């Protein structure tokens, strides 16, 4: 695959071109996008792109906090992390707090719910089992609760319908923010620590939002029967640079080369974090964020709700000018 996909001399600068005028990489990119458009598992996602596009643009407009120090103010061991998470959950829902502690120390047939790894891994939760590397820092403490919220909400029925879990990262991103604020209020971490956590999460969410907007634009081109060409892709990137915190041109090109080389789009996974970031920001401004968290949490562990219903809820509750209730 040509690594210099966008460093080119091309004749494809005409608006109306035929398939015969495309080079091999352009043909491949069009093929990748067409396969996603036609795939049954992707059609409900693509049908909701208008809503997802608006959410992406809102996430990109969120302001990153000011960081005064780039180091954490303290170390936090895993036992303290578990203790603080339990104390915090008690302020939201005692049943949830009890479930957290039961699962943390659950060890049935050597199958632990919380699995601490000794080497670096990207934290994840699989079939109700949480896997993290604990580094005794504040970020690890937040990550531990994030993955345990996934584990606590797991069910076999939900796993079976995992493709429809577009809100699956919403309770975890909400809980990250609420837990971080509680830690500041109880003088366990500093305001700068909170800002570091918020900046880390928002930066990742905005990166995913930029990439998802690019994927949506590629799908839109093909749905309009336009061939994806290098010129059109570069124009698309340049047109979106006015959006706050949109990725740089170089980052966009690097990402689209990844799509081309891997023959894969990533919007299905990315939109979970983007929606979570969007809802977390809205709930942060509400009168009772703890109640809002519980509503979202119980909604996401319901295996019978589909993506379309989730997005209707988002439109009704969180795309209003004012959710101060």
Name the predicted role of every residue range.
Residues 184-261:
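Long, amphipathic alpha-helical stalk/connector segments used for oligomerization, subunit docking
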Residues 157, 162-204:
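Post-HExxH zinc-binding segment in Zn-dependent metallohydrolases
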Residues 2, 8-133:
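Active-site-proximal, well-structured secondary-structure segments within enzyme catalytic domains
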Residues 91-100, 151, 155-161, 181-192, ...:
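Secondary-structure transition/capping motifs at alpha-helix termini
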Residues 174-181, 185, 216-219, 278-285:
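Short glycine/serine- and small hydrophobic-enriched flexible loop segments
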Residues 127-144, 159:
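Short pre-active-site segment immediately N-terminal to the catalytic Zn-binding motif
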């Amino acid at each position: 695959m040509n690594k210099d996909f966008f460093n080119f001399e091309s004749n494809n600068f005409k608006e109306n071109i035929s398939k015969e005028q495309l080079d091999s990489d352009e043909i491949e990119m069009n093929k990748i996008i067409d396969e996603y458009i036609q795939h049954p598992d992707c059609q409900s996602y693509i049908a909701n792109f208008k809503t997802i596009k608006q959410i992406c643009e809102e996430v990109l407009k969120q302001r990153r906090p000011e960081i005064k120090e780039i180091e954490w103010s303290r170390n936090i061991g895993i036992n303290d992390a578990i203790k603080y998470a339990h104390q915090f959950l008690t302020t939201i829902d005692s049943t949830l707090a009890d479930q957290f502690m039961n699962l943390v120390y659950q060890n049935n047939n050597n199958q632990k719910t919380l699995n601490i790894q000794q080497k670096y891994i990207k934290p994840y939760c699989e079939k109700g089992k949480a896997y993290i590397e604990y580094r005794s820092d504040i970020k690890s403490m937040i990550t531990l609760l994030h993955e345990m919220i996934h584990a606590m909400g797991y069910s076999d029925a939900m796993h079976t319908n995992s493709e429809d879990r577009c809100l699956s990262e919403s309770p975890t991103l909400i809980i990250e923010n609420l837990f971080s604020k509680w830690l500041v209020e109880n003088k366990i971490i500093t305001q700068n620590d909170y800002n570091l956590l918020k900046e880390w999460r928002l930066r990742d969410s905005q990166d995913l939002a930029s990439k998802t907007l690019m994927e949506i634009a590629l799908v839109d081109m093909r749905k309009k029967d336009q061939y994806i060409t290098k010129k059109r892709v570069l124009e698309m990137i340049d047109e979106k640079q006015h959006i706050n915190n949109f990725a740089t041109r170089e980052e966009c090109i690097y990402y689209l080369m990844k799509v081309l080389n891997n023959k894969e789009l990533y919007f299905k996974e990315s939109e979970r974090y983007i929606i979570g970031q969007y809802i977390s920001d809205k709930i942060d401004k509400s009168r009772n964020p703890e109640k809002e968290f519980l509503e979202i949490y119980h909604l996401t562990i319901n295996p019978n709700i589909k993506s379309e219903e989730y997005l209707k809820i988002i439109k009704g509750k969180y795309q209003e000018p004012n959710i101060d209730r």
